[in-house]
Amino acid sequence: MIPRTRTLLQSKIPITRYFARCWAPRVRYNVCRTLPAAALHTNIIAHNEVKKDDKKVHLGSFKVDKPKMMIAFTCKKCNTRSSHTMSKQAYEKGTVLISCPHCKVRHLIADHLKIFHDHHVTVEQLMKANGEQVSQDVGDLEFEDIPDSLKDVLGKYAKNNSENASQLPHPSQK
């Protein structure tokens, strides 16, 4: 005799057998029929095209550079200074963890998805709550903190750059 908790709709068929007989074949069939492999590609193209008189007219496309942010910090565990880049969107709307290159400890930089905290939090808020100093000024950068890929762009604003850097205007001054 099958226990009552394992039956479906007062029938004597166990739940697992019921789903195996009735639901599973239909679900597999519907998923395969409604999501062909080419449909995803076609939907993406449809946003860039408009039908006019049964002809597709290309609207155009453009490339948008994703804004990036750079962070330089000293790991409190191993006292190693490092700098990293991240997307601005991830910092403002997602969760960002950065791994220390020396000791491999992960540092929480931003948590807007509430994975680690019950509210939206950024590293700036955490440091200010602990009474630590946070600087967003490009002029506070040390030349050694800047990643090699950004030295051409940000190196001229670093404090300890060559003598030519002192003659360049600060980014806030135009």
UniProtKB/Swiss-Prot annotation:
Keywords of this entry: Chaperone, Membrane, Metal-binding, Mitochondrion, Mitochondrion inner membrane, Protein transport, Transit peptide, Transport, Zinc, Zinc-finger
UniProt induction comment: By heat shock (at protein level).
Transmembrane intervals: none
Keyword Signal listed: no
One Gene Ontology cellular component annotation held by this UniProt entry: mitochondrial matrix
Zinc finger residue extent: DNL-type: 64-159
Main location per the UniProt record: mitochondrion
Example GO molecular function: zinc ion binding
Cofactor(s) the protein needs: Zn(2+)
Misc remark: Present with 1520 molecules/cell in log phase SD medium.
Function: Involved in protein import into mitochondria. Acts as a Hsp70-specific chaperone that prevents self-aggregation of the matrix Hsp70 chaperones SSC1 (mtHSP70) and SSQ1, thereby maintaining their function in mitochondrial protein import and Fe/S protein biosynthesis. May act together with PAM18 as co-chaperone to facilitate recognition and folding of imported proteins by SSC1 in the mitochondrial matrix.
Protein name, entry field: Mitochondrial protein import protein ZIM17
Annotated organism of origin: Saccharomyces cerevisiae (strain ATCC 204508 / S288c) (Baker's yeast)
GN (gene name): ZIM17
